[in-house]
Amino acid sequence: MATLTTARRLVVKIGSALLVDRNTGDLRADWLHSLAADVAWLKGLGLDVILVSSGSIALGRGVLGLPRTALPLEQSQAAAAVGQIRLARAYEEALAPHRITTAQVLVTLEDSEDRRRYLNSRATLETLLGLGAVPIVNENDTVATDEIRYGDNDRLAAQIAVTVGADQLILLSDVDGFYTGNPSDDPGATRFDVIDRITPEIVAMAGDAGSGLSKGGMKTKLMAAQMATAGGCAMAITEGSPLNPLKTLENGANCTWFTATLDPQAARKRWIAAMKPRGDITVDAGAARALEGGKSLLPAGVASVTGDFGRGDPVAILGPDGRRLGQGLCRYTGDEARAIRGRQSSDIEATLGYPGRAALIHRDDMAL
């Protein structure tokens, strides 16, 4: 069974029922500060940590005097707009005593469908982690109408985990794992300790285990598990209401682990390799050797570019003899790539009229 301290990069999803008192609508400050202590402990061990947090609507509705029942879409968006400020400030205040810098990142599931936005969000998160910050990710509830209606922070957390190549995703929830049935309705329901494969029988067991404040249920958690494990990320569902929930999990709290068969990097390369290329980039002999040595593809090593493709689109990488070396996600459009081919990275801004990334295709976005 996995342990948190063996992870390199960890994504933790926090449900709104954990952050907000269901009776008063107030923030559970003591719980949040205990979570912050856990994050500091993990970072002290060398882990990268990203938090994906619900709670903006739950916090905002109390400030606006809205009922704690289902809200019309416009009121949900208004509550999110008010609550998001308070949510970000609460995390900043909780982590500041540990000398941890926080960053707010608002995304939607649609950001993963547009490859240009996907690459941009990935680069931003990687930069924040490299600088030692803890990104606090939330879906942009003020504009993401589908996400508000259906509650997708579980899947959003899985998408973030896959995007950044995390090896573990922890869903802190109001249930302590995945059961054979809904334990509130079925006293005979039993909890799985480990699920190695999500079978049709497992899917059929997923019932709605949501709360009055959380909008996600067990079905969305199972969808998150499918997405995460396919991307090489193991996932755990555990009950998160105790203080210091991550240390509690590390010390043996009840949970269900969904195992991943591939490591994140291998899963990502398989995903890239399976895409249909939108163009070809032919490299010179020096660049071909550099790629084989694990380097990124720089404009200086590009001999020719064919095809009409956009930023983030997959392209085939060909050697000087026309042999296919692999493929990757290009950080420039076809026209931009043609303009900067053969040039030094330092000349990109002068050539295009605006600054760009040094690599045409980063090694992390390449499958050879």
Curated annotation (Swiss-Prot):
GO BP of this protein: L-proline biosynthetic process
Keyword Nucleotide-binding included in the entry's annotation: yes
GO molecular function annotation: ATP binding; glutamate 5-kinase activity; RNA binding
Keywords: Amino-acid biosynthesis, ATP-binding, Cytoplasm, Kinase, Nucleotide-binding, Proline biosynthesis, Transferase
Residues engaged in binding ATP: K13, S173, D174
GO cellular component term of the entry, any: cytosol
Catalytic activity: L-glutamate + ATP = L-glutamyl 5-phosphate + ADP
Keyword Cell inner membrane tagged: no
Binding site for substrate: S54, D141, N153
Gene3D superfamilies: Acetylglutamate kinase-like, PUA domain
PANTHER family reported in the protein's UniProt record: GLUTAMATE 5-KINASE, ISOPENTENYL PHOSPHATE KINASE
Function text: Catalyzes the transfer of a phosphate group to glutamate to form L-glutamate 5-phosphate.
Annotated protein name in UniProt: Glutamate 5-kinase
Organism from which the protein derives: Ruegeria pomeroyi (strain ATCC 700808 / DSM 15171 / DSS-3)
Upper taxonomic lineage: Bacteria, Pseudomonadati, Pseudomonadota, Alphaproteobacteria, Rhodobacterales
